[in-house]
Amino acid sequence: MSSRKGKLYVVGVGPGNHDHMTYRAKMIIEKSEVIIGYDTYVSLVEDLITGKEVYRYAMTQEVDRANQAIDFAEKGRIVSLVSSGDPGIYGMVGLIYEILAQKGWNREDSSSIYVECVPGVSSLNSCAALVGSPLMTDFAVVSMSDLLVPWDIIVKRVEAAAMGDYVTVIYNPASKKRVHQLRDTREIFLKYRKPDTPIAIVKGAYRESQEIVVTTLDKMLEHQDMLGMITTVIVGNSSTFNYEGMMINPRGYTSKYELIKQQQQQQPTKQ
C-alpha cells in the first residue's frame, strides 16, 4: 500500500443532467485521479473527466468495478466510483462496504483508506418532481429486478405496499429478459386499488430522451414501450388524484385547515 492515504468516493451523479448534480459531486469528480463506473453512468460526466484515468464497465460487472475502485484507493489514489441517482439507493455504496467489511477495513485506522458516499438526487426525487406531488405521505420503494432478490420476495413486498395503501415507487420495472414482473405487480395493486388510481411513468428523467406519461393503473400496460432500466413508475394510493396532468397526493391539510381563506386571520411577521 502506498504511504499516501487513498480516498474512495462513491459519487451519486443524479438523474443525468448537470443542473441536478450536487456541487460536491462535481467537485469530487473534478479532483479525482481515477474514474470508475458503468459505461452509461461515466458518459453522464464525460465533460468533467478529461485527462483522467477512466475505467468503463458493462452491466452486471458491479463486483469487478467495486474491487478495482478499492484496489486503486489502497494504492494511494483518489478514486470516484460513479453511480447514477443516489449511490445509497440501489447504488454501489452498499457493495463497497460489504467488500470492505470482508477485508476487515477499519474506518478509524489512520492507515486505512478514506471512504465517503457523496449523495445524489435519486430517481424517486427527480421523477416525483416532474409529475406533481405524489410522495407527500408515506411511500414504499420496490425494485422489480430479480437478479439479486428472488421474485417471490419481491412479490411479498409489493403485496405489503399495496395492502398498506402506500404510494409505491417502482424501480427497474422491466428489461429485455423481464417482461412479466410489472404485469404481475399491476394485478396485485388492482386487488387493493381502484382501476382509475393515478400512476406516472417517467423514462430518462431530466435527460434529452425524457418521456412522461400520467395515466391510470388499469391503463399501465398500454405504455409498455416506455418500460426499461431508466424508467420509474409511481403508483398512487387511495387519496392520490390527477389534476392538470399531475399526480397530487394530499398531505392531510384539508381535514384540518381551510385551504383557501378569504382573509388571513394572523399576519406573518415581516422582517
Predicted regions located by residue number:
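Short beta-strand segments
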Residues: 11-12, 81-84, 142-145, 170-171, ...
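A polyampholytic, Gly/Pro-enriched intrinsically disordered region
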Residues: 76-83, 133-143, 162-166, 218-229
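A contiguous loop/helix-start segment that scaffolds small-molecule binding in enzyme catalytic cores
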Residues: 163-271
